[in-house]
């Protein structure tokens, strides 16, 4: 019985290593400088109109550009 549990434990550790589980230190809230560098907002979208402060075309809203001009 103990042998089977040991084999099962080894198989589980090989399939799901502990390094695959995200640690607390890997959270974006702990790294504000990197979070600021990775800022991908709608203002950097090629369909965004900076004068109107909205997306140029209505169909671009389906692609994730927001807010829509209407």
Swiss-Prot record:
Signal peptide extent: 1-20
GO MF assignments: ion channel inhibitor activity; sodium channel regulator activity; toxin activity
Disulfide bonds: 54-69, 55-65, 61-68
Similarity annotation: Belongs to the conotoxin M superfamily.
UniProt remark on domains: The cysteine framework is III (CC-C-C-CC). Classified in the M-2 branch, since 2 residues stand between the fourth and the fifth cysteine residues.
UniProt xrefs under Pfam families: Conotoxin (PF02950)
Predominant cellular place of this UniProt entry's protein: secreted
Residues where Cysteine amide is found: 69
Organism: Conus amadis
InterPro entries: Conotoxin
Protein name (record): Mu-conotoxin-like Am3.4
Function in brief: Mu-conotoxins block voltage-gated sodium channels (Nav).
Alphabetized UniProt keyword annotations: Amidation, Cleavage on pair of basic residues, Disulfide bond, Hydroxylation, Ion channel impairing toxin, Neurotoxin, Secreted, Signal, Toxin, Voltage-gated sodium channel impairing toxin
Gene Ontology cellular component annotations, sorted alphabetically: extracellular region
Localization terms from the record: Secreted
Tissue: Expressed by the venom duct.
Propeptide residue range(s): 21-53
Sites bearing 4-hydroxyproline, chain numbering: 67
Post-translational modification: Contains 3 disulfide bonds.
């Amino acid at each position: 019985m103990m042998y089977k549990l040991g084999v099962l434990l080894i198989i589980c550790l090989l399939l799901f290593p502990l390094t695959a589980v995200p640690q607390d230190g890997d959270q974006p809230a702990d790294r504000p400088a990197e979070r600021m560098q990775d800022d991908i907002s709608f203002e950097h979208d090629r369909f965004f109109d900076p004068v109107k402060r909205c997306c140029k075309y209505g169909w671009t809203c389906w692609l994730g550009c927001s807010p829509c001009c209407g």
